[in-house]
Amino acid sequence: MKYGAVLLSSLLTTSVLATSGEIDCAQAATNYEVNHCASIELEQAQEELQRYLKTSLDLNQDDRELSQAISNAQQSWEQYYEAHCQAILTKWREGTIRTTMALTCKTQLTKQRTHELWASFLTYVDNTSPELPEPQM
Protein backbone atom coordinates (compact mmCIF):
# COMPACT_ATOMS: atom_id res chain seq x y z
CA MET A 1 0.00 0.00 0.00
CA LYS A 2 2.78 2.38 0.94
CA TYR A 3 4.56 1.62 -2.37
CA GLY A 4 1.36 2.39 -4.29
CA ALA A 5 1.02 5.78 -2.58
CA VAL A 6 4.63 6.66 -3.36
CA LEU A 7 4.19 5.55 -6.97
CA LEU A 8 0.97 7.55 -7.33
CA SER A 9 2.61 10.62 -5.80
CA SER A 10 5.56 10.23 -8.16
CA LEU A 11 3.29 9.89 -11.18
CA LEU A 12 1.27 12.94 -10.20
CA THR A 13 4.42 14.99 -9.70
CA THR A 14 5.79 13.85 -13.05
CA SER A 15 2.48 14.63 -14.72
CA VAL A 16 2.38 18.12 -13.23
CA LEU A 17 5.96 18.81 -14.32
CA ALA A 18 5.26 17.55 -17.82
CA THR A 19 2.13 19.60 -18.27
CA SER A 20 3.43 22.73 -16.63
CA GLY A 21 6.05 23.13 -19.33
CA GLU A 22 9.02 23.04 -16.96
CA ILE A 23 11.04 20.80 -19.28
CA ASP A 24 13.21 22.80 -21.64
CA CYS A 25 13.49 20.50 -24.64
CA ALA A 26 16.50 22.40 -25.93
CA GLN A 27 18.29 21.42 -22.73
CA ALA A 28 16.84 17.92 -22.26
CA ALA A 29 19.45 15.71 -20.62
CA THR A 30 17.81 12.83 -18.78
CA ASN A 31 16.10 9.90 -20.47
CA TYR A 32 12.79 11.12 -19.09
CA GLU A 33 13.28 14.62 -20.51
CA VAL A 34 14.50 13.40 -23.90
CA ASN A 35 11.61 10.93 -24.19
CA HIS A 36 9.11 13.55 -23.06
CA CYS A 37 10.34 15.97 -25.70
CA ALA A 38 10.42 13.23 -28.36
CA SER A 39 6.81 12.40 -27.46
CA ILE A 40 5.79 16.02 -27.92
CA GLU A 41 7.49 16.15 -31.32
CA LEU A 42 5.75 12.92 -32.36
CA GLU A 43 2.37 14.23 -31.23
CA GLN A 44 2.85 17.41 -33.27
CA ALA A 45 3.90 15.39 -36.32
CA GLN A 46 0.85 13.13 -35.95
CA GLU A 47 -1.47 16.13 -35.71
CA GLU A 48 0.04 17.56 -38.89
CA LEU A 49 -0.29 14.18 -40.63
CA GLN A 50 -3.98 14.02 -39.71
CA ARG A 51 -4.52 17.52 -41.10
CA TYR A 52 -2.85 16.63 -44.42
CA LEU A 53 -4.69 13.30 -44.61
CA LYS A 54 -8.05 14.94 -43.90
CA THR A 55 -7.40 17.62 -46.51
CA SER A 56 -6.37 14.95 -49.05
CA LEU A 57 -9.59 13.04 -48.41
CA ASP A 58 -11.79 16.15 -48.34
CA LEU A 59 -10.30 17.46 -51.58
CA ASN A 60 -11.03 14.16 -53.31
CA GLN A 61 -14.34 13.29 -51.66
CA ASP A 62 -16.19 13.33 -55.00
CA ASP A 63 -13.94 10.55 -56.29
CA ARG A 64 -14.90 7.61 -54.09
CA GLU A 65 -12.39 5.29 -55.71
CA LEU A 66 -9.51 7.68 -55.03
CA SER A 67 -10.71 8.42 -51.49
CA GLN A 68 -10.86 4.70 -50.76
CA ALA A 69 -7.41 4.19 -52.28
CA ILE A 70 -5.97 6.94 -50.07
CA SER A 71 -7.62 5.38 -47.01
CA ASN A 72 -6.34 1.92 -47.93
CA ALA A 73 -2.83 3.26 -48.47
CA GLN A 74 -2.98 4.98 -45.08
CA GLN A 75 -4.01 1.76 -43.36
CA SER A 76 -1.16 -0.11 -45.06
CA TRP A 77 1.27 2.63 -44.10
CA GLU A 78 0.12 2.47 -40.46
CA GLN A 79 0.85 -1.27 -40.38
CA TYR A 80 4.31 -0.66 -41.84
CA TYR A 81 4.91 2.22 -39.40
CA GLU A 82 4.12 0.03 -36.40
CA ALA A 83 6.13 -2.96 -37.65
CA HIS A 84 9.17 -0.93 -38.65
CA CYS A 85 9.36 1.09 -35.44
CA GLN A 86 8.80 -2.09 -33.41
CA ALA A 87 11.86 -3.51 -35.19
CA ILE A 88 13.81 -0.39 -34.17
CA LEU A 89 12.66 -0.87 -30.57
CA THR A 90 13.77 -4.50 -30.75
CA LYS A 91 17.16 -3.51 -32.14
CA TRP A 92 17.75 -1.23 -29.16
CA ARG A 93 15.90 -3.39 -26.59
CA GLU A 94 18.94 -3.75 -24.32
CA GLY A 95 19.61 -0.04 -23.98
CA THR A 96 18.01 2.89 -22.25
CA ILE A 97 17.90 4.62 -25.62
CA ARG A 98 15.27 2.18 -26.97
CA THR A 99 12.27 4.42 -26.30
CA THR A 100 13.97 7.46 -27.80
CA MET A 101 14.93 5.49 -30.90
CA ALA A 102 11.38 4.16 -31.35
CA LEU A 103 9.87 7.63 -30.90
CA THR A 104 12.37 9.08 -33.36
CA CYS A 105 11.48 6.35 -35.85
CA LYS A 106 7.79 7.16 -35.53
CA THR A 107 8.37 10.89 -35.90
CA GLN A 108 10.55 10.49 -38.99
CA LEU A 109 8.10 8.12 -40.69
CA THR A 110 5.17 10.38 -39.80
CA LYS A 111 6.88 13.41 -41.32
CA GLN A 112 7.78 11.42 -44.43
CA ARG A 113 4.19 10.23 -44.81
CA THR A 114 2.88 13.77 -44.41
CA HIS A 115 5.20 14.90 -47.18
CA GLU A 116 4.09 11.99 -49.39
CA LEU A 117 0.44 12.97 -48.93
CA TRP A 118 1.27 16.57 -49.77
CA ALA A 119 3.27 15.68 -52.89
CA SER A 120 0.77 13.08 -54.13
CA PHE A 121 -2.61 14.64 -53.38
CA LEU A 122 -2.23 18.30 -52.41
CA THR A 123 -0.03 19.68 -55.20
CA TYR A 124 -0.62 20.22 -58.89
CA VAL A 125 1.50 19.63 -62.01
CA ASP A 126 1.00 23.21 -63.20
CA ASN A 127 1.74 26.40 -61.28
CA THR A 128 -1.39 26.14 -59.13
CA SER A 129 -0.57 26.71 -55.48
CA PRO A 130 -0.70 23.60 -53.30
CA GLU A 131 -3.68 23.11 -51.01
CA LEU A 132 -1.43 23.24 -47.92
CA PRO A 133 2.15 24.42 -47.47
CA GLU A 134 4.95 21.93 -47.99
CA PRO A 135 5.49 20.13 -44.69
CA GLN A 136 8.93 20.22 -43.15
CA MET A 137 10.85 17.00 -43.01
Question: Model-derived features: where do they sit?
Answer:
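Sec-dependent signal peptide recognition
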Residues: M1-S9
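N-terminal alpha-helical modules
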Residues: A18-M137
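N-terminal signal peptide c-region/cleavage motif recognized by signal peptidases
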Residues: T13-V16
